[in-house]
Amino acid sequence: MISVMAPGSEKTGKVETILKKRVLLAISGGVDSSVAALLLKEEGYEVAGVTMCLGVREEENKVRCCGREAIEDARGVCEILGIPHYVLDYAPLLETCVIDKFVREYRLGRTPNPCIDCNRYLKFGHLLDSARTMGFDYLATGHYAKIERKESRWILKKAKDLVKDQTYFLYPIPVAALEHILFPLADRTKDEVREIARQALLPIAEKPESQDLCFVTQDSYRDFLQEQGCPVHPGPIVDRSGRVLGEHSGTVFYTIGQRHGLGISSPFPLYVVAIDVAGNSVIVSGKEDVYAQGLVAGEMNWLTPERPQEAEARIRHRKRTCSCRIVPEGDRIRVYFAEDQDAVTPGQAVVLYQEDEVLGGGVIEEALHYAN
């Protein structure tokens, strides 16, 4: 039996005594998850790697994670580290849990965040269930985030590397699941992680980060949406008075706050401020109309037993947080910003923080403007 500091325990003082505690690590073949595996092994855990196969056709293997090349990279790292490697076929789950919603949201004129849904349903839903079924004590990933013990409960916090912090994408983790999840990179920076990979002579040490949607193998998401049957009908681009200024190529190709690619001549910059799917029109206006005083959010997931009245809100990944007031409305909330926020986009997430702790989050349904 060996004693090791549980990840984050240097902050909580918790020492975990483990008898080869078993960890299933989601490994994509990238540097983050590979170093996470190495760190867990060095800490004394019994580690196995698992890669989700998302069903990309080999002749179209342009995917940056979870494709054939990624699976081979993950397998190679596991061999170097001397740990088992599993591949689970998650293609049907990806289709029903992520892609179907992705397409449906665009049909409704919203801009979804499929990475959040992947975390919600696949990684910290089905994969966590699989880990427990397979006899593992924990599921670990290479996310930059931190889980700590606070009094009698587990909390989700921002990572040490605030530039790489991924808590915006992790708010849907069920609160009861936090105690079964490990984030080995919680107190590492990206530069430190790459250096660890170099020192360990891992072949993926210089591998670039994935940027694209993992399930879009075409040159652009536009092609993907058309393949999925999204209606693409040209229509008018209008100002708030209804005056036609130009023509759009399909409402699914536009998002709130978009400025470029409108094809409109104007003496001042114009931005997309609304998408009218029923009328097949895109509404544009000046920069001042991009700002909102608040939002309505649904599909809430709370990670704290108390419902806060004030918090810091983040409406996009890497956008700075702003102070806000929270008003509950049944299973939804209204969020009122201390400072107006630009491009509040239905379909994206709003995540609520108290200092470094994630309080919860939800899906933006509506932006609130002064005229409402």
Curated annotation (Swiss-Prot):
Annotated Gene Ontology cellular components are: cytoplasm
Cysteine pairs bridged by disulfides in the record: 118-214
Q: Where is this site: Interaction with tRNA?
A: 143, 348
Give the UniProt record's GO annotations in the biological process aspect.
Answer: tRNA wobble position uridine thiolation
Please classify the protein's predominant subcellular localization into one broad category.
cytoplasm
Report the active site residues. Answer: 118, 214
This protein's record includes keyword Transferase? yes
- What InterPro entries does UniProt report for this protein, alphabetically? MnmA-like, MnmA-like_C, MnmA-like_central, MnmA-like_central_sf, Rossmann-like_a/b/a_fold
* EC number(s) recorded for this UniProt protein: 2.8.1.13
Q: Which Pfam families match?
A: tRNA_Me_trans, tRNA_Me_trans_C, tRNA_Me_trans_M
Chain's role: Catalyzes the 2-thiolation of uridine at the wobble position (U34) of tRNA, leading to the formation of s(2)U34.
* Annotated family: Belongs to the MnmA/TRMU family.
Q: What is this protein called?
A: tRNA-specific 2-thiouridylase MnmA 1
What organism does this protein naturally occur in? Syntrophus aciditrophicus (strain SB)
Q: Which gene encodes it?
A: mnmA1
